[in-house]
Design a protein with these regions (language model features):
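Short alpha-helical transmembrane segments in multi-pass integral membrane proteins
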Residues: 1-18, 76-141, 185-241, 297-364, ...
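N-terminal transmembrane alpha-helices
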Residues: 5-43, 56-71, 75, 100-107, ...
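Small-residue-rich hydrophobic transmembrane alpha-helices
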Residues: 48-108, 145-164, 271-335, 369-391
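Transmembrane helical elements of multi-pass membrane transporters/channels
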Residues: 16-35, 137, 148, 171, ...
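Short runs within selected transmembrane alpha-helices of multi-pass transporters and secretion channels
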Residues: 69, 138-156, 164-172, 193-206, ...
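Helix-terminus/linker motif at the lipid-water interface of multi-pass membrane proteins
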Residues: 30-49, 118-125, 181-188, 248-281, ...
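Hydrophobic transmembrane alpha-helices of multi-pass small-molecule transporters
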Residues: 60-63, 175-180, 205-209, 281-284, ...
Length: 459
C-alpha cells in the first residue's frame, strides 16, 4: 500500500503519482460543480449567484483546513523516507488530536458567525439569505472535511495516491444523486446542495478511515504511540499552521475581491462563478502536480536526495507547460459549451460573454500558475512552509490593490486581471525562495557529511 519515491525515474514517478491525484481532485471539484450546475440550471441565476457569493469565504475556511492537513502530512512523508516507523506513528496520532481540536473550534465559530460574515461581504440583498443558509451548512460539515483530508494526506505521505481516488469516485456519485433528489424532487434549493455536499464528505471520510485502519499495517500503533506529545504537536503545527494560513492569506485577497465584485451586481457574480468553477476544474491538474511534488520532496529530503528534488522540479515544469497549452486550446474552442453547463446560453447572453472573457484572461496565465504551484509545494515538502506562506501574502496584496484601485476604475475588466496579477506576484517571490531553500539544504547536508567524515578521522 505504501510507495517509496526516493528511487526511479523522477518524471515517471511524479507523473504516475500525479494521475490519481488529478482524477481525485477532479472528482472533489465535482462536489462543487454538481451544486453549481444543478442550482444554476434548475433553480436559476439568482441561486447560482447565491452559491457563488460564498466561494471566497468557503475557500478562506476550508482552504485553511485542507492546507493544515497537508502540512501535518509533510513530517510524516519525511519520516517515511527516513524509515523511522515508530516516530511516524506518533506523528499520525498527534495529527489526529490536532484535527479533532481544530475541527470542534472552527465548526462552532464559523457557524455562529455565518450571517455577520455575509453581511460584511456586502452580499447583494436579493441573495444574502440563501448565501447565509448555504455556507452555514457547509461550515457545519467542517469535521468531515478534516476527516477525509487528513486520512488522504496520510495515504499520500506514504506513497498511495490511488486509494483516495476510489473513494472520491463513489462519493462524487452520491453527491450528484443527492443534489438531484434534494434540489429537484424535494425543492430544497441551495440548502439541498449544501446538505448533499456534507453527506458526501462524511461518506468519503468514514470509508477512507476504515480503509486506512485495516490496510496500512505500518500505522498499527501501541498505546504509548497514541499519547499526546507537546514536541510532536509543535513540529506538526510548525508545518500545518503556515500551510493553512497560506491558503487563508491567499483567500483573504479573494474575499476582498469578492467584496468588490459583489458591488458590481448579481449578474457579474454569476458570470465569475461560472468562469471560476471552470478555472478551478482545469487547474486541478496543476494542483495535483504540486501535491505530488510535496510528497516527493518530503520523502527525498528524508532520504537526503536533494539532487532528485531538483530533477523532480524540472520534470514538473515539463508537465505544467504541456498541460497549460492543452487547457488553453480546450477553453478557446469549448468555452461556450462549458459555460452552458451552468447557464442558458440563449437567454443569458451578457453573462455568458463576461464569463468567456474571464476564462480567456485566466487561461493565458496557466503556465505561471503551474510554476508557482510547483515551487510552493516543493518548498513546503522540504519543510519551509513559512516561506511558501509569504507567497500567499504577495497574492493577497496584488488582489487587494486590484479590488481597491482597478475595479472602481475599470469595472469588470479589473476583476478579470485579479488572478493573473496575483499569480505573477507570487512567482516573483517563490522562484528565488525555491532556489534559496534547495541551496540552503544542500549546504546543510554537505556540512553534516563533512562533520561525520571529520569525526570518523578523529576516531
Amino acid at each position: 500500500m505504501t510507495k517509496d519515491l526516493t528511487s526511479g525515474n523522477p518524471f515517471k514517478i511524479i507523473l504516475l503519482f500525479t494521475l490519481p491525484l488529478m482524477l481525485g481532485n477532479l472528482f472533489q471539484q465535482f462536489y462543487s460543480l454538481a451544486d453549481t450546475i444543478i442550482v444554476g440550471r434548475f433553480v436559476g441565476v439568482n441561486a447560482l449567484a447565491t452559491v457563488g457569493a460564498t466561494g471566497s469565504v468557503n475557500y478562506l475556511i476550508l482552504g485553511f483546513v485542507i492546507g493544515m492537513c497537508n502540512g501535518f502530512a509533510i513530517p510524516i512523508a519525511q519520516l517515511f523516507g527516513a524509515h523511522d516507523d515508530s516516530d511516524l506513528r506518533r506523528h499520525v496520532a498527534n495529527a489526529t488530536w490536532l484535527c479533532i481540536a481544530w475541527g470542534v473550534v472552527l465548526t462552532v465559530v464559523t457557524v455562529a458567525l455565518t450571517r455577520p460574515i455575509m453581511e460584511l461581504m456586502q452580499t447583494p440583498a436579493d441573495i444574502i439569505d440563501g448565501a447565509s443558509t448555504y455556507i452555514g451548512w457547509i461550515f457545519a460539515g467542517i469535521p468531515f472535511v478534516f476527516l477525509y483530508n487528513m486520512v488522504s494526506a496520510i495515504m499520500r505521505a506514504l506513497g498511495d495516491s490511488k486509494t483516495p481516488l476510489y473513494f472520491l469516485v463513489l462519493t462524487s456519485a452520491v453527491n450528484i444523486v443527492l443534489d438531484l433528489v434534494l434540489i429537484i424532487n424535494f425543492n430544497m434549493g441551495v440548502l439541498g446542495a449544501a446538505v448533499a455536499t456534507d453527506v458526501s464528505q462524511a461518506i468519503s471520510g468514514v470509508i477512507s478511515l476504515i480503509y486506512l485502519i485495516k490496510k496500512f499495517k505500518i500505522l498499527h500503533m501501541t498505546r504509548d504511540e497514541w499519547k499526546y506529545s507537546r514536541s510532536t504537536c509543535r513540529r506538526l503545527s510548525a508545518m500545518g499552521l503556515p500551510m493553512g494560513l497560506q491558503c487563508t492569506i491567499t483567500a483573504v485577497g479573494g474575499v476582498i475581491m469578492q467584496w468588490a465584485v459583489n458591488g458590481l451586481g448579481s449578474s457579474v457574480v454569476a458570470a465569475i462563478t461560472a468562469a471560476g468553477k471552470t478555472q478551478n476544474l482545469l487547474s486541478c491538474a496543476l494542483e495535483s502536480i504540486g501535491t505530488a511534488m510535496a510528497t516527493y520532496a518530503g520523502q527525498n529530503l528524508g532520504a537526503a536526495r536533494l539532487d532528485r528534488v531538483r530533477s523532480g522540479v524540472k520534470s514538473s515544469y515539463i508537465m505544467v507547460v504541456a498541460y497549460s497549452v492543452l487547457a488553453f486550446i480546450a477553453l478557446h474552442f469549448g468555452d461556450v459549451v462549458i459555460i452552458g453547463l451552468f447557464l442558458d446560453t440563449k437567454t443569458e447572453v451578457e453573462i455568458v460573454a463576461m464569463a468567456r472573457d474571464y476564462m480567456f484572461w485566466n487561461s493565458l496565465f496557466f503556465i505561471p500558475l503551474g510554476a508557482l504551484i510547483v515551487w510552493r509545494y516543493t518548498i513546503q515538502g522540504l519543510g519551509y512552509s513559512t516561506l511558501a506562506m509569504m507567497a500567499g501574502v504577495a497574492e493577497m496584496v496584488a488582489r487587494t490593490v486590484i479590488a481597491l484601485v482597478l475595479i472602481p476604475v475599470l469595472g469588470y475588466f479589473g476583476a478579470e486581471l485579479s488572478n493573473p496579477a496575483a499569480w505573477v506576484a507570487a512567482c516573483l517571490f517563490l522562484y528565488p525562495a525555491y532556489l534559496w531553500t534547495v541551496k540552503h539544504l544542500e549546504n546543510r547536508l554537505l556540512a553534516g557529511h563533512l562533520a561525520m567524515q571529520h569525526s570518523a578521522v578523529g576516531d
